[in-house]
């Protein structure tokens, strides 16, 4: 009985008549036999001697005539037949790629298609391997660029005969094909792996990117160490071993050295960065002991060359609870021997990762941060380092009782409190929050964990259902020819000035979730001198993008407009103005950008061996050139303005071992230097114009003093006062009348001022702040001390909506100015009131770029704005 596999299961067993012929053979046998007897009689002793000589011969031949064998090594049995000795017939299996995944189409309309091939059997991989030689990606939208096709090549496959396991391929080549040019090779990435043994399998030893001509652009080299591991209880010992091959040993193969090289198409590469790792080999568990880094190219694979910095790490553990590898001390030392950072940590080793204290050395002190935990491992309290007055800011956390994992309350040393509640435990989302000033915010979530609506204190007070709402349509409409209606999401912004007409934004995505179009409400004005003002409510549609064969934006078009009523219909229109065209190199960097007015910006990438930097040279449309030199850490080490009336202008930048900027030299040789402490805080700046300015700090990081070059002559400094980490005062040594004081709202403050700046006093007087429900400043009371005159007080008030748009402003003379917005959210009209109403601005008009095109003042004066259609410039 045979049950056939149909891919997703087996059919009902059937009787297969040919099963008896799965293996047939034929045999032929021949034999011959001869014998005779000879007798000799001896009468005297009555003995008779007889002998029976004989011989026999035979041979047989047996050969299969019908069998199932894997002849071609594809992993499937072939039919082998032979009816005579001189003939062999093979019927190859047609299974091949049958039942292998061919294509996947998701609900967004995207499809990726896979192909398969069988590698040629070799000595290293006798049976070969089914592999994926190509992958084609279709985003479902076919008028914005070609399909993306990637081809793969596999080499040096290895099967460990001893372990009977496939160790992988020694080399994998990824080829990006230009589907716009008949699948011509554009670039290839080559990854080489160590497959020499079971313990080293899968280690990446080399990775490079090349162009179609085989010129290398980048390369990464990795080197590994090999160790045998022996354990005595929880004490491990690692013994170096160049070749790892054992049936019983445990092995450790860590990364020792990494070098990154930049070629930019040249024959010789330049090392831009190196990293070297050292590990604990005795008494530990193979943790990282030290790490060295260099962007100078002088470190070497043994780590014995010059380096920028070295990070050394020490650990603690609790073997009885299998808690291992907790770092207790991290020290960063520069190549010059200077200690840049030193941080120590203390743990409660009864629990994993219960970090209880972090101590950072500052050079003239230390900064200590403490943590406390509950029985579930949640942080109960975090206490920050002390300020100059010994105050330590702390935060306490309380968790909801259902799951004991989500924070429901946060309190601090000021007595402030914020809360969260009504959790959707499916997704860990708090649906209700309360801020420091006791205002609530609500969030609606659907059954898929997506936010569908948000309400703030303004909406909760007025009964408005949302300030922002979201609608989702994640399933596209598509056929075999592509997407006909892309998936989209709608964002609604409630507009208090147009309560029946939300400001809406619709975002469309392609088959792989990439945003391809955004529509938004807008008002476009057609107005020019001598014509009638015309404003139309439309949807402004973002410009279409055309992608190249590698998913990069090759052409970017200007936006278009459409009439209302089609918000969820994908707009396929392309603007008539020439697009912005971008050309890229094989590393996906823009090399040429052509704007609609045909002006071009060119970018060239080269290397400079002298400074060991990547040089990026930009030439704009006017021929101006600037070169930027970047080191292996991504820091700018030099800029050169290569054109201009003053000739070449050069600025150089120097960094310490951990990439802090310490020296800037301009083209005339003027030098600015900076000095830092162990907390990365700048303690001194020496500027050629202003001289030396020094700063001091407390352990919390607050600036305590600032001393300029002029104040240093008198031995004086500007000082700063704090309450925990909040600035409360600035004190000037020579003019105390100019001192500044800051006052903040306490836990019972009114006017929504809890935790916010309430009053500032300075030499000119004072200013008091009042706030709205969402933290916006709604009123200020400014008191000025005018010499030889009375004290003057000025009150200014503002009203904002929940989108932080200014709706109304009341000046100190009680004039009220209101601001009106169009359906697209742009300012449209400004009107004033004082005794009577009058317009400041009657009308403001905009184009599809939301640039101003029209402005009419109350006196009838009109201003028209026109733009170059190609360059979009005035």
Residue ranges, per PLM feature:
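Repeat-based blade/solenoid architectures
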Residues: 20-34, 55-66, 110-115
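Acidic/hydrophobic-patterned starts of short beta strands in beta-sheet-rich repeat architectures
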Residues: 1, 73-82
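Beta-propeller blade termini
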Residues: 62-71, 99-102, 119-122
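Beta-propeller fold detector
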Residues: 12-19
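Structural motif
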Residues: 86-92
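Calcium-coordinating acidic loop motifs
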Residues: 6, 70-76, 95-96, 106-107
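Beta-strand elements of repeat-based all-beta scaffolds
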Residues: 102-105, 112, 116, 124-126, ...
């Amino acid at each position: 009985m045979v049950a056939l596999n149909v891919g997703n299961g087996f059919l009902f067993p059937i009787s297969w008549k040919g099963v008896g012929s799965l293996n047939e053979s034929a045999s032929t046998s021949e034999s011959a036999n001869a014998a005779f007897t000879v007798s000799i009689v001896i009468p005297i002793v009555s003995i008779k001697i007889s002998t029976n000589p004989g011989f026999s011969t035979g041979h047989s031949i047996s050969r299969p005539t019908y069998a199932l064998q894997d002849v071609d090594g594809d992993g499937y049995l072939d039919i082998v037949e032979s009816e005579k000795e001189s003939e062999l017939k093979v019927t190859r299996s047609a299974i091949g790629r049958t039942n292998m995944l061919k294509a996947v189409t998701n609900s967004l309309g995207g499809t990726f298609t896979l192909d398969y091939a069988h590698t040629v059997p070799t000595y290293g991989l006798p049976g070969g391997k089914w592999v994926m030689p190509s992958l084609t990606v279709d985003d479902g939208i076919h008028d914005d660029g070609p399909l993306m096709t990637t081809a793969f090549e596999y080499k040096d496959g290895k099967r460990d005969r001893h372990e009977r396991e496939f160790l992988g391929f020694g080399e994998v080549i990824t080829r990006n094909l230009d589907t716009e040019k008949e699948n011509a090779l554009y670039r290839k990435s080559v990854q080489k792996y160590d497959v020499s043994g079971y313990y080293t399998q899968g280690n990446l030893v080399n990775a490079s990117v090349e162009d179609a001509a085989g010129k290398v652009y980048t390369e990464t080299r990795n080197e590994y160490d090999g160790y045998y591991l022996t354990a005595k209880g929880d004490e491990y010992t690692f013994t170096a071993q160049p070749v790892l091959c054992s049936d019983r040993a445990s092995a450790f193969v860590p990364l020792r050295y990494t070098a990154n090289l930049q070629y930019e198409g040249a024959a010789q590469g330049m090392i831009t960065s190196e990293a070297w790792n050292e590990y604990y080999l005795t008494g530990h568990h193979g943790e990282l002991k030290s790490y060295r880094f260099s962007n100078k190219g002088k470190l070497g694979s043994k780590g014995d060359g010059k380096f920028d910095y070295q990070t050394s790490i020490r650990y603690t553990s609790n073997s009885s609870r299998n808690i291992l590898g907790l770092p207790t001390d991290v020290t960063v030392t520069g190549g010059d021997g200077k200690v840049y950072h030193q941080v120590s940590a203390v743990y409660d080793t009864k629990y994993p990762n219960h970090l209880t204290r972090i101590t950072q050395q500052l050079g003239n002190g230390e900064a200590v941060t403490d943590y406390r935990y509950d029985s579930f491992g949640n942080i109960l309290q975090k206490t920050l380092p002390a300020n100059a007055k010994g105050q330590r800011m702390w935060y306490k956390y309380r968790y909801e009782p259902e799951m004991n994992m989500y924070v429901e309350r946060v309190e601090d040393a000021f007595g402030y409190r914020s809360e969260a509640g009504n959790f959707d435990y499916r997704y860990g989302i708090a649906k209700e929050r309360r801020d420091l000033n006791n205002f609530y915010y609500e969030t609606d979530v659907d059954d898929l964990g997506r936010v569908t609506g948000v309400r703030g204190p303004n909406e909760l007070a007025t009964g408005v259902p949302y300030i922002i709402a979201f609608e989702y349509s994640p399933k596209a409409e598509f056929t075999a020819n592509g997407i006909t209606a892309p998936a989209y999401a709608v964002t609604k912004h409630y507009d208090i000035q147009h309560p029946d007409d939300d400001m809406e934004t619709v975002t469309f995505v392609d088959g792989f979730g990439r945003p391809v179009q955004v529509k938004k409400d807008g008002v476009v004005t057609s107005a020019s001198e001598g014509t009638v003002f015309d404003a139309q409510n439309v949807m402004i549609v973002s410009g279409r993008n055309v992608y190249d064969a590698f998913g990069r934006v090759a052409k970017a078009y200007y936006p278009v407009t459409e009439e209302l009523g089609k918000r969820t219909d994908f707009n396929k229109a392309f603007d008539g103005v020439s697009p912005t065209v971008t050309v890229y190199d094989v590393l996906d960097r823009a090399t040429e950008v052509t704007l609609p007015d045909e002006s071009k910006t060119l970018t060239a990438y080269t290397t400079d061996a002298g400074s060991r930097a990547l040089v990026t040279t930009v030439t704009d449309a006017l021929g101006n050139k600037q070169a930027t030199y970047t080191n292996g850490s991504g820091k700018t080490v030099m800029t050169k303005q290569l054109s201009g009336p003053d000739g070449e202008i050069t600025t150089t930048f120097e960094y310490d071992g951990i990439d802090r900027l310490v020296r800037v030299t301009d083209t005339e040789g003027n030098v600015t230097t900076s000095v830092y402490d162990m907390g990365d805080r700048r303690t001194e700046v020496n500027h050629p114009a202003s001289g030396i300015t020094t700063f001091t700090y407390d352990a919390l990081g607050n600036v305590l003093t600032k001393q300029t070059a002029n104040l240093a002559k008198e031995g004086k400094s500007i000082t700063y006062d704090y309450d925990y980490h909040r600035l409360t005062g600035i004190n000037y040594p020579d003019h105390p009348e100019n001192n500044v004081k800051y006052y903040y709202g306490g836990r019972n403050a009114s006017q929504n001022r809890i935790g916010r700046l309430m009053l500032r006093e300075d030499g000119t007087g004072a200013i008091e702040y009042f706030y709205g429900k969402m933290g916006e400043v709604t009123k200020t009371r400014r008191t000025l001390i005018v010499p030889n005159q009375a004290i003057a007080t000025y009150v200014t008030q503002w009203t904002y909506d929940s989108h932080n748009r200014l709706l109304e402003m009341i000046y100190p003379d009680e004039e009220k100015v209101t601001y009106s917005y169009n359906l697209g959210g742009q300012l449209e009209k400004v009107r004033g009131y004082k005794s009577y109403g009058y317009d400041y601005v009657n009308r403001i008009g905009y184009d599809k770029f939301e640039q101003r095109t029209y402005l009419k003042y109350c006196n009838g004066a009109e201003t028209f704005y026109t733009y170059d259609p190609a360059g979009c410039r005035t």
